[in-house]
Amino acid sequence: ARGTMLLYHYRPLADEIFRVPILLVMATSSRGYILDLAPGQSFVEYLLKCGYDVYMLDWAPPTAAEKHLNLATYVDDFIPDCISKVQADSGETDVTLAAYCMGGVLSTMYMALNPDGPVKNFVCFTTPINWHGMGLFSSFSDKRWFDVDKLVDSLGNVPPEVIVASFDMLRPASRFAGNIRLWDNMWNDEAVKAYRRLERWGNDTLPLAGEYFRDTTKKLMWD
């Protein structure tokens, strides 16, 4: 751990192990346990049983003293630092990056800046690449009415409530629809447990470092 950066190592659960380790890079607003919710409901568990050596770059809530962390900090510092730690711990030079959501954005930027780096394979999922095709997100953050400087200068770090509200505006009926699905499966104990796990994660959003939020808004959403 180093400030908001957390690095975990999961041991393989197979006799034959792939040589190249996998580094999972989480979204900066999401807790990493979404990929390891419970036995039988875990992407990490699946990879371990397949024989992969799995590491995860996860995030702790940034403190008030970390409000200065910006886009470059994540791309040029945290990701290469974790890759170096994975290399040292595994004894391997090559690394596979598998990145989720904004973790994929950061990893894509790292890859573009380090084309001859140690990443052998790169996979990203639910990752926005074309920022001009962000639809409602682009409308919500339009510079004509969204003053990101005022927001960050006033609050420092951006609280999770702001992040959750933005996603709720994108899908205003999603919570209601989720409750309907829960009701339809009320007598299925496993379905209820799985729903509660996912719902807990969905409400366990992280705040974002102020300068990082300012950077992503201006350099990605606006530029």
Residue ranges of model-derived segments:
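Short, surface-exposed "cap/lid" segments of acyl-processing enzymes
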Residues: 1-63
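A structural signal for isolated positions on well-ordered beta-strands in alpha/beta enzyme cores
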Residues: 55, 96, 121-123
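Conserved catalytic-core motifs of eukaryotic protein kinase domains, centered on the activation segment
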Residues: 66-68, 135
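Alpha/beta-hydrolase active-site loop
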Residues: 68-89
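Alpha/beta-hydrolase-fold enzymes
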Residues: 88, 92, 107-211
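Gly/Ala-rich beta-loop-alpha elbow adjacent to hydrolase catalytic centers
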Residues: 98-107
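Active-site nucleophile elbow and catalytic-triad environment of alpha/beta-hydrolase enzymes
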Residues: 219-223
